[in-house]
Amino acid sequence: SVRENVEVSALGAGAGPRRAAERADDLLARLGLDRYADAPAAALAHGDERRLGVARALAMEPRFVLLDEPAAGLPEAEVPAFAELVRSVRDEHGAVGCLIYPNMALIMEICDRLHELDQGRTLAEGAPAEIRGNLDVAAAYLGETAVAEE
């Protein structure tokens, strides 16, 4: 079940059965999955599967969270809600995070600090406002022609 998926993660991180069940119920409620708690995880829609993955990760009470293209495959209409979920993970759980995602608008909205790479090389590091105005980043993501026309 969806609940068992989250409980197993908490148990694997050392929580006792009671704490694992409490943690699962809390996370499912906070991530909007409580109505599916007893449903098979395989029956979830894609966006709900993504939220379940976040719940499983948070059940382990990590200090660091790596999100590698967490909204990949979601319909565009669901991306803002998922961005809000990522923000709440950052703000409420206090975990340091690393977010890998090609949608620069989403990255700029969610992240406090960016490390931009192009072909494995660092282009720039800094706050979103600094990165937004960086010509090397613009050239890499928009193409040199687009930068020259601006």
Place the predicted regions along the sequence by residue.
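Conserved catalytic motifs of ABC-family nucleotide-binding domains
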Residues: E61
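Catalytic Walker B motif of ABC-type/P-loop ATPase nucleotide-binding domains
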Residues: V65-E69
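Conserved ABC ATPase "signature" region
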Residues: E7, R18-Y36, E84-S88
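Conserved ABC ATPase signature
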Residues: P40-L44
